[in-house]
């Protein structure tokens, strides 16, 4: 089974997270996507909703969408959410499956700063979401890694055994949506219906999340 993994603060989860994940799922013919809320993001000091509330919002989204599942292993952890530790745990949970860790190009270009970043390739494939026509600049520190590990969708279709260590780039539709923008709109009394799944908006309104 091919399993995609998308982590994030999801404060709140919105179409800017969901639509690219759906496009990756379709492009790589993934069997399912694990949506994984962070508990203690290494690069962020605070969130605007509780871990329990963010878990519930993601759980409701997964119930509404086919092929999406909540993964709460980082949310249950009392230590920073280092990706290498998470992938080690997921590799034990899914020993016979092929893992695809999904990130944006903005994260990939800084991958060398991540904790034990080279070990990520020993545990999973990396999927880099990029806007159509975007390319990593020549001479960028991650250019060598991308060139050495880059795999095509055609190669994926011909592989029968689970593999890791490859990098797949997937063109995704631009999403001009951010959690910060959504929180600001809600704080001003605006309802960002086009940015949120109905179940998420309903939960936010019932819980009075992000309202001033």
UniProtKB/Swiss-Prot annotation:
Entry keywords, A to Z: ATP-binding, NAD, Nucleotide-binding, Nucleotidyltransferase, Pyridine nucleotide biosynthesis, Transferase
GO: which molecular function terms?
ATP binding; nicotinate-nucleotide adenylyltransferase activity
Keyword DNA damage in annotation? no
Q: What is its EC number?
A: 2.7.7.18
Q: Which organism is it from?
A: Shewanella sp. (strain ANA-3)
Pathway field of the UniProt record reads: Cofactor biosynthesis; NAD(+) biosynthesis; deamido-NAD(+) from nicotinate D-ribonucleotide: step 1/1
- SUPFAM superfamilies registered for this protein in UniProt: Nucleotidylyl transferase
Question: What is catalysed by this protein?
Answer: nicotinate beta-D-ribonucleotide + ATP + H(+) = deamido-NAD(+) + diphosphate
Role according to the record: Catalyzes the reversible adenylation of nicotinate mononucleotide (NaMN) to nicotinic acid adenine dinucleotide (NaAD).
The UniProt entry's sequence similarity note says: Belongs to the NadD family.
User: What EC class does the entry list?
Assistant: transferase
What the entry lists under CDD domains is as follows:
NMNAT
InterPro entries from the xrefs? Answer: Cyt_trans-like (IPR004821), NadD/NMNAT (IPR005248), Rossmann-like_a/b/a_fold (IPR014729)
Q: What is this protein called?
A: Probable nicotinate-nucleotide adenylyltransferase
An annotated GO BP = NAD biosynthetic process
UniProt-listed HAMAP family: NaMN_adenylyltr
